[in-house]
Amino acid sequence: MDANGVDLTRLDGVFVRQQTQMADVGYLVFGVPYVTANKYQVFSLPPVAHEWVPTAQEVAGFEEIMFIHEESDTSDRVGWAFLGAASLRPLQYHFGSTSTGQMFTAVKSFKIGGWCGCPWEMDVLSGPPGDQILKGQVVQNFTPYCSRCFDAFCLATTFIDVVPASSFPGKDARFTVRTSLSCCGRVNNCCAPTCCRPKAIFDILDNSGKLVGVVQKHFVAGEGGEACCRMCLGVVNFSLKFPPQSSGEERALLLSAIMLNESYQPTA
């Protein structure tokens, strides 16, 4: 899938930067139960080492190739924020090319989580509104149940399956994104990404459990007070290194899987 303008198979990976929205700072300071619709810039990931830590100067020099915009109802953002559960709100992520516009859409419905038999999921669609084609799903993996409960509640680890439409109806995962926020995983991600530990590293596994790619979540140094503000608000920067043999469709699904996982991460 070339996503109508951006051939994802030609990229080693992408760097995604959530835009700082100062209105969120005001809502937080004054205790207003509201969150703004999130917006992200997507850049082509330059050839970088595994332990890359981006600087503000590097990020400023990146060329934007895509954007991601959240579409959600204002009433949902107010209502769920009032309940302290803004991450549960239904939404759509519109992925677009800076040159050609809309590329594909990821639709997230209301799901509490696999712990109660309601795993997170998003449908990934391409095509114009009213004539969209399902390209696949990204869904929280909660099987076996007891093991995944232990992973989630004791190890702060979640698993998101990437399921291309070609795998239906069996829904066999092509990749799994393993996100660990603790010190107990393959990489110690405790207190990351912050000024103390500038990156967290998450794993992309193939259907045999082999490590085939990584996602790095970054604290971008050199931005002064803005960097600290972004950290406290949970505003994200992450880089996604695509598995070498993945198709364009699979890469779009992997990017959607990261967005699904991010949409459920707690923020300030």
Describe the residue ranges of each PLM region.
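Low-complexity or membrane-interfacial segments used for flexible interactions
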Residues: 1-123, 127-268
